[in-house]
Amino acid sequence: LELLLNGGFSPLTGFMTSADHGSVCADMRLADGTLWPIPITLDVPEATAEKLSTGGTLALRDDEGVMLAVLHAEDIWRPDREAEAQAVFGTTNREHPGVGQLLDRTEPVYVGGRLEGLQPVSHYDYKELRHTPTELRAAFTKLGWTKVVAFQTRNPMHRAHQELTLRAAKEVEANLLIHPVVGMTKPGDVDHYTRVRCYQALLPRYPQKTAMLSLLPLAMRMGGPREAVWHAIIRKNHGCTHLVVGRDHAGPGSDSNGNAFYGPYDAQELLSKHEAELGVTMVPFKLMVFVEETDSYTPIDEVPEGKRTLNLSGTELRDRLAKGKEVPSWFTFPTVAEELARSHPPRHEQGFTLLFTGLSGSGKSTIANVLLVKLLEMGGRAVTLLDGDLVRKNLSSELGFSREHRDINIRRIGYVASEITKNGGVAVCAPIAPFDSVRKQVRAMIEPLGGFMVVHVATPLEVCERRDRKGLYAKARAGIIKEFTGISDPYEAPEDAEIVIDTTTLTAEEAAQQIILHLEKEGYVAGKA
C-alpha cells in the first residue's frame, strides 16, 4: 500500500484488476503493454467480498484502525492461485516462501481498483532513513548525484558486499545507494532493526559523500528473475540509474532436496533483456570470495589459479548466529560483528519453545509439568507452561473443536510462546496440536526469535485409550464427544519432530530427562562458567 501511494510502484495507482493480473502472470506486462513482472493484488476474505460490489469502496486501515486509503473497487474475482504461482515463481512447491505465502496465507478473493490516499503510512523506526521516491530524487539533486547505483539487500552487509558495491560504483563512476528491504523478507532472516544497525556500522567504510543509506518498505516475494526486473523498476522510480545484480538475486535458495529454485545468474539474464526498455543499467557481479594470500575479496572468476579461497554461505552464517558462534574476521568487519552478537546471544542465553504434540492421554501434560520443574530448578530463565487445558480455559474459551478453531487455538499458543522466546524465556507448550500445517506456522513464527523444538509424544492410540483417566475415549467411542482426535478426528504425526518419545515403557521423569539431554546437546542448557 505504501509504495502504491508514494509512487514507488509507478505507473500503478492501485491494486491490479483481473486484466492486469492475468497479463502480468502470462507476459510480465500490464494490459496496456507496460513492463511489470510481479502481481500487486489486494486479497480479501469471502465475507468481505460478499459485502462489496464493483463501483463500491473499501476502507484500508492499519493495525491500529487508522484509515490510510480508500480503494475504489473496479474488479472482484477469484484467481487461480496455483496458476499464478507457476507463472510468477516457476513452481508450486510450498517450500518456496513466495509460493507458501500465496497458496497458504492469501485470502481467496482479489479486489482491484484505484486507490485514494488519505494519509501516509506511519513508521516510528529510523525515520531519518525513510524516503519517498520524490524525497530521494530531491536528495540526489541536492547532492549533485546524476548517476546512482542501487544495492538491493535483505541481509546484513559484510566485507564481500562492501567490496562488491565499491567496485560497482567505481566501474560505472556513480554514487552508491544502499537500499535494503525492511518489509517482509524470507523466514529466518535477520530482523531489520539489527540489519539497519549493521548498515550504519558499515557506512563509514565508504569514501565520504559517495554513499547513502535509505530503507525500502517492500515485501519481497523471493521471485528471482522476475523480482530482479521489479527491483529495477522500483529503483528507477526512486531516482537510480543503475542496479547491482549479483548471484541468485532475490532467490530463495534450494528446496529440501537441494534443488535450486533458480539458476545462479537467471536474474541477470532476464534483466539484461529488459534494461534498455526500463532505462536502468544492470551492474552484474559474480560470487565474491576471500583470497587468503591477498587478504581481500575478489570475484570468483578472477581468482588466480592455485590461490586458496574462503567463503561463508548465508545458511552457514545464520547457523553460526543461531548458535551464538563467533563470525570470522575475514568475513565481516568488527563493528558489524558486534551488532550481530548483540542480537544473537549464545544458545544457553537464548529463549526457546518446546511444542509438545500427541494424542490425549499420551503423557504430554505430565511430562511437560515434570520438565517445567526441572527447568525452574536449573534457573537462569523464566519458564512458562502453556498446557492445552489451561489455554482452552484462559485464552480460547470461546473456541470449539473444528479444524478452524483448533488451528486458531494453536496459533494463539504460538504467538504467546513467540513473545516468551523473543524475551529470553522458555515456553513449554502442551496442546494436542493434531495438524501439521499449523505446527509449521508456529515453527516459522518462533524460529527467527530463538530455539524451537517439536516434541512428539508418540504413545500409541491403544495405550492412550487403555489409560483414559478422564473417560474421554469411552465417551468418544459412544458418540457422546464429537470431533475427538484419534477417534473421529485425524491426528497428523509430525515428520519434523526434534524429539520423539513413547511413554509406553517410559516414566514421565525418564521422558523429561531425555528432553533435558537433548537441550544440553543442542547448547540450550549449559553448566556455570
Question: What do the predicted segments below correspond to?
Answer:
Residues L1-H348:
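Active-site cores that bind ATP or allylic diphosphates and position pyrophosphate for catalysis
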